[in-house]
Amino acid sequence: MNKSEAEAKIRALRREINEHNYNYYNLAKPKISDYDFDALLRTLAELEAKYPDLVTPDSPSQRVGGEVTKNFPIVRHKTRMLSLSNTYNLGELGDFLARVAKSLESEGVQAYDFTAELKYDGVAVSLIYRDGLLVQGATRGDGSQGDEITANLKTVRTIPLRLRAPASGSAFDTEKWNGSGDIEVRGEVFMTKADFEKINAERDESEQFANPRNATAGTLKQQDSREVAKRRLTMVAYYLDGRPFADLSHGERLEKLAELGFYTGEAHRTCRSLQDIQAFLDEWENKRDALAYEIDGAVIKLNNVRYQELLGATSKSPRWAIAYKYAARRAETVLENVVFQVGRTGAITPVAELQPVKLSGSVISRSTLHNLDEIRRLDLHIGDRVIIEKSGDVIPKVVGVVAEKRPPEARTIEPLSTCPSCGTPLEHPENEVIYYCPNEFGCPAQRKARLVHFASRHAMDIEGLGEAVVEQLLGAGLIGDPGDLYFIEKTALLALERFAEKSAQNLLNGIEASKSRSFERLIFALGIRYVGRRTASILADRFTSLDTIKSASQAELCETEEIGETIAKSVALFFTKPQVQELLGKLERAGLRLASDKKSPDAPQTFAGMTVVFTGSLENFTRDDAAAKVGERGGKVTSTVSKKTSLVVAGKEAGGKLAKAEKLGVKIVTEAEFQTMLAAESGD
């Protein structure tokens, strides 16, 4: 066989293998045996090995995985990957439908419908195709940006490496499919119940995954794509965006996704009423246990994409969609003991130790009890038969006692008076249900919890620095507070058990990477009592640096929107402590961001009093960055165009919002003109 004959054979093999892949993974209708399929793959691999210059990125041989990736690059999403608001009851679902109806009627829309789709319990990802070829795959991350995991996603059999050719007579416009018209597909990657059980059977008990979703998330974080390939992940596609599909409804886009080679799920249905939706929900709740994978409900979406744009979104979720979650599943087990944990702020939390019981695919042996008042409310005793509940990814909780089954030897749960970690007498602030250990910097449990929090995903996101490693570093005396992390030397790590050259360097790389985290994430990472992610973001917007926060009085802090007296007092007190001053000094020497990248509050108020709407794709900003620039300059950004809108910034592929702005006579500027407005304020 000469090279030209081999090239023709390779093309034919790829077509045949891709077709069999589609039949097997998307249609569940295999036409040949596994043995024959493997034989085709082997023949292809042999020919490509003989003629390596004929290997292409979309060849089926490239799914097996390649080199190890040391770190995942961060990529920004074209548009934010928002989460969905959710409900567990039909009444709230009806309220959602009523809100949609009211909003659409105010826009003169009378006829519309919805799609109902199964809600798969997995990990959301985004795929970018250029000229039909998969060029990028990324995790949802924080919604604005995520990890670029293209190599790992290429191993997922239901993700086409190259999109299938459109059917004859398709509305798909290949003329518009070019570099400026990239196509984005989003979906949920998940693992079947059978594959989940198989993976756990091969792992030590202490390393087993809690559920298929956790197993999927852990798999996608693997740095060796060959390992990912072994775990047989699946993706269901639910979102399609690109110029060729601009006029299609959501339901039509799902059909187009299937045509292009994607798996679009077990079922989706067009619904016109609450009764239609309820019928879909009931049908699949009855069928869910028979499915090969976990579902936790259904997603209801407004079908017309133009109407979706009219409704827009809040900062967290779209107004045109909602997730209906099936009722939590319950199980009965024995409360064997109650232990008390000390958190990063000194809060004492009782934790139930349970006789292990299987629930929703997980083995449950522990559950939070929140506080002592909850123990009293439930009248819990050691030895009681208790009811536990678990819904989706929520931590399991004890919701009741089977009082008639209480054994004679059941014991009451005695409240604590001293800290279980350091022995300090506990304090009980007025108007709070939580007890606290006041030994903030001397309590070993608080020190450990603060470090774990500092390294956590929503804080500094330090890869490889989990609870066990924190405990090891504390035990070796290498760290005392988060600032010490940035001065650890590799030689010190190599002297510790379980640390080799690679693991030590990986940890140091993770610590170094955390220096680039945003100012608001650093505020959250400090672990100030009552300061969660939302409050940290508010502080970062209001104050430009840690120095300005430190120097702010309690009264000035109280003047900040959404910050009341309790939070203000806690923040002001935190920065007066010598240990905090020492920590901030270390962080500054290490080169962390102790100030915001945003302009100061006295930046020119170009958009003061204005309401701005962005539409279409922006080339030089993400939506979040553009909105931030408006906010810093006194304006407000909304997602819908109305008579109150002052300005519409129109990017590429602007849709219904642009048309509505023209109809209402709202001022419209291009992205270039928006940039000119920003530049003019500084005389650039």
UniProtKB/Swiss-Prot annotation:
One of its GO terms (cellular component) is cytosol. Residues 602-684 form the BRCT domain. Belongs to the NAD-dependent DNA ligase family. LigA subfamily. NAD(+) binds at D34, Y35, D36, F37, D38, S83, L84, E117, R140, E188, K301, K325. Its cofactor is Mg(2+); Mn(2+). GO terms for molecular function: DNA binding; DNA ligase (NAD+) activity; metal ion binding. It catalyses: NAD(+) + (deoxyribonucleotide)n-3'-hydroxyl + 5'-phospho-(deoxyribonucleotide)m = (deoxyribonucleotide)n+m + AMP + beta-nicotinamide D-nucleotide. The gene is ligA. PROSITE patterns: BRCT, DNA_LIGASE_N2. One of its GO terms (biological process) is DNA repair. It comes from the Bacteria. Its EC number is 6.5.1.2. DNA ligase that catalyzes the formation of phosphodiester linkages between 5'-phosphoryl and 3'-hydroxyl groups in double-stranded DNA using NAD as a coenzyme and as the energy source for the reaction. It is essential for DNA replication and repair of damaged DNA. It is an enzyme of class 6 (ligase). Pfam families: BRCT, DNA_ligase_aden, DNA_ligase_OB, DNA_ligase_ZBD, HHH_2, HHH_5, Nlig-Ia. Keywords: DNA damage, DNA repair, DNA replication, Ligase, Magnesium, Manganese, Metal-binding, NAD, Zinc. It comes from Chloroherpeton thalassium (strain ATCC 35110 / GB-78). This is DNA ligase. PANTHER family: CHROMOSOME TRANSMISSION FIDELITY FACTOR 18 (PTHR23389), DNA LIGASE (PTHR23389:SF9). The active site is at K119 (n6-amp-lysine intermediate). Zn(2+) binds at C419, C422, C437, C443.
